Amino acid sequence: MGKLYVFDHPLIQHKITYIRDKNTGTKEFRELVDEVASLMAFEITRDLPLEEIEIETPVSKAKTKVIAGKKLGLIPILRAGLGMVDGILKLIPAAKVGHIGLYRDPKTLQPVEYYVKLPTDVEERDFIVLDPMLATGGSAAEAINSLKKRGAKHIKLMCIVAAPEGVKVVQEEHPDVDIYVAALDEKLNDHGYVVPGLGDAGDRLFGTK
């Protein structure tokens, strides 16, 4: 079974308070999501392997460490996942960015795939799937399915808030995928929204309804 990691860092929790607040405007909401994504990326990449190289400082030669050639891929689930990309690229500028477009059918709450664009070397990359909200889990599970069908073998899921129901769905469908969240919320309501949640992340990021 994939592990669930809930980040309790004070900076993350502070920023999530204002992400949740309905009075937070589009500009500030966008900036906060970007910042939280950066902070989460710092933790989610903690297990990247290192290798030793030799460099020359202004003073002497030195042996030091760099990331051991791992190829990372970021996969935002359109459209809300786009809000998390830049925050991670600030720390990992060499990461490739693919896109998976999914929307949730308002009647069935099931995900419908409408767009997929991935790096050409899928099998060689470690992927991080990005979605601010893990609600029913359907979209995240489908995005992971889409990656696996195209050859991806190492996948992590990163969300800002999650409902227990969504976590359960992803863990049952993809027991090899670890889930990283900034907050584990109470439940889903009858409309499939996370409670207390943060509303519709896509609408709040892009100022739409």
Curated annotation (Swiss-Prot):
Annotated residues for binding of uracil: V194, G199, D200, A201
- Catalytic activity, reaction form: UMP + diphosphate = 5-phospho-alpha-D-ribose 1-diphosphate + uracil
| One of the protein's GO biological processes | UMP salvage
One Pfam family it belongs to = UPRTase
Function description = Catalyzes the conversion of uracil and 5-phospho-alpha-D-ribose 1-diphosphate (PRPP) to UMP and diphosphate.
Q: Which organism is it from?
A: Bacillus cytotoxicus (strain DSM 22905 / CIP 110041 / 391-98 / NVH 391-98)
State the name under which the record lists this protein.
Uracil phosphoribosyltransferase
Quote the HAMAP family the UniProt record gives.
Upp_B
EC code(s) of this entry: 2.4.2.9
List, alphabetically, the InterPro entries matched.
PRibTrfase_dom, PRTase-like, Upp_B, UPRTase/APRTase, Ura_phspho_trans
Q: Which NCBIfam families match?
A: PRK00129.1 (NF001097), upp (TIGR01091)
Instruction: Give the metabolic or biological pathway.
Output: Pyrimidine metabolism; UMP biosynthesis via salvage pathway; UMP from uracil: step 1/1
Gene3D superfamilies in UniProt: 3.40.50.2020
Q: Does the keyword Nucleotide-binding apply?
A: yes
Family label: Belongs to the UPRTase family.
Chain residues that bind 5-phospho-alpha-D-ribose 1-diphosphate: R79, R104, D131, P132, M133, L134, A135, T136, G137, G138, S139, D200
- What keywords appear on the UniProt entry? Allosteric enzyme, Glycosyltransferase, GTP-binding, Magnesium, Nucleotide-binding, Transferase
User: Which molecular function GO terms apply here?
Assistant: GTP binding; magnesium ion binding; uracil phosphoribosyltransferase activity
**What is the regulation of this protein's activity?**
Allosterically activated by GTP.
Per UniProt, the cofactor note for this protein states: Binds 1 Mg(2+) ion per subunit. The magnesium is bound as Mg-PRPP.
Q: Which cofactor does it need?
A: Mg(2+)
